Amino acid sequence: MQNIYYFHGFDGFLTHEKRKILENFGNVIAPTYNYRDAQTLTQIKESFFEKDLKGSVFIGTSFGGYVANYLSTIYDKPNLLFNPALLFRTLKMGLDAPLTSSLQSLSYFVLGEKDRLLNYGDNVRFITDYFKGPTEIIIEKEMGHHIPPNIFDKQADNFFKMIAEK
């Protein structure tokens, strides 16, 4: 059974409903993080040094998408990112993965057209400029920053089907 590492958004958490959706696809590991603590990102990064990541995937929403993307870049693992805060990568955040890595694993982005916090167009430009591996970009026209369970379920299902085909 594959491990699914889920990273929530800033001041967020994985809801019970979304956890149940992900449990259909594997073993869900989703601690709650305090991203306000400057050491949190370093602790997350260091916690993966010794892990066996065979068959693992990274999933994140908003700021958790930034973290999940960082880890998937370092370890070349598939990632599913909902409204990821990718533009934070341009700030000094303690995560120094190269932006232009050529990955073999899929990066699957779900962006809300109605997101008022993270502009989907900025994310699309960033993704097309910097991501060199296989990417899939989905624009959900009715989605804002928060991801409704039905969209989360549909896109998780699509993502896991795509990585199963590889």
Enumerate the predicted regions with their spans.
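Acidic catalytic loop of the alpha/beta-hydrolase fold
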Residues: 12-13, 113-119, 145-146
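Gly/Ala-rich beta-loop-alpha elbow adjacent to hydrolase catalytic centers
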Residues: 59-68
